[in-house]
Amino acid sequence: MSMLCYTLITAFLIGIWAAPKSEDNVPLGSPATSDLSDTSCAQTHEGLKTSRNTDQRHPAPQKAEDQELRTAANIIVDPKLFQKRQFQSPRVLFSTQPPLLSRDEESVEFLDNEDSLNRNIRAKREDHPVHNLGEHSVCDSVSAWVTKTTATDIKGNTVTVMENVNLDNKVYKQYFFETKCKNPNPVPSGCRGIDSSHWNSYCTETDTFIKALTMEGNQASWRFIRIDTACVCVITKKTGN
């Protein structure tokens, strides 16, 4: 009798140990597995949504230069700032449309038009004209209106130039009239017309400082910046001559 009871108790215990102890042992398709899958998917979706929201709240860091340039384009300029403008240069123009050179491309005029902030200026600059008398320039140059985002100021520091100016709900672009060399060596020996047997020569740009509208902190301010204004010939005497 005792042996029979011992056998029944042992069989009962083996049956209990063989029973599933967690949802991990539940067959696929059972309610426990479905709930677990749904919970896991919900947690994954919630995690992705949280990560996406976190990225929106904390965007990737941007370069300081890019942020400053974007700020410069959105700043609204007080018209009184132009009344305080001094040392006005004909090489700086604020306009809503790209300025054009004259037809012969040898001079430039600032016309009185309502799309320009330089209405009181009318200037003309020569671009090394070649006359019909057999005259030639020592160096060949080219002039054009350009825009700038950075420049070197009179102290040698790199500053941010305002490319776009928002004035009275109208966006003006700041243009600069620059002159550059077409080629440092217009002829194989260097500058044109230089005696290469006694002199070394080459063409290079020279610059000048003009007043331009720049960014200083979060405010617009006038500052002297450097631009190229001419192409000249540099000569050095050859040694042994």
UniProtKB/Swiss-Prot annotation:
The keyword Metal-binding does not apply. Residues 19-125 form a propeptide. Residues 1-18 form the signal peptide. Expressed by the venom gland. InterPro entries: Cystine-knot_cytokine (IPR029034), Nerve_growth_factor-like (IPR020408), Nerve_growth_factor-rel (IPR002072), Nerve_growth_factor_bsu (IPR020425), Nerve_growth_factor_CS (IPR019846), Venom_nerve_growth_factor (IPR020433). Disulfide bonds join C139-C203, C181-C231, C191-C233. Keywords: Cleavage on pair of basic residues, Disulfide bond, Growth factor, Lipid-binding, Metalloenzyme inhibitor, Metalloprotease inhibitor, Protease inhibitor, Secreted, Signal, Toxin. One of its GO terms (molecular function) is metalloendopeptidase inhibitor activity. SMART domains: NGF (SM00140). The keyword Secreted applies. GO terms for cellular component: axon; dendrite; extracellular space; synaptic vesicle. Residues 47-67 are annotated as: Disordered. GO terms for biological process: cell surface receptor protein tyrosine kinase signaling pathway; modulation of chemical synaptic transmission; negative regulation of neuron apoptotic process; nerve development; nerve growth factor signaling pathway; neuron projection morphogenesis. It is found in: Secreted. Nerve growth factor is important for the development and maintenance of the sympathetic and sensory nervous systems. It stimulates division and differentiation of sympathetic and embryonic sensory neurons as well as basal forebrain cholinergic neurons in the brain. Its relevance in the snake venom is not clear. However, it has been shown to inhibit metalloproteinase-dependent proteolysis of platelet glycoprotein Ib alpha, suggesting a metalloproteinase inhibition to prevent metalloprotease autodigestion and/or protection against prey proteases. Belongs to the NGF-beta family. PANTHER family: BETA-NERVE GROWTH FACTOR (PTHR11589:SF10), NERVE GROWTH FACTOR NGF -RELATED (PTHR11589). Homodimer; non-covalently linked. This is Venom nerve growth factor 2. The lineage of its organism: Eukaryota, Metazoa, Chordata, Craniata, Vertebrata.
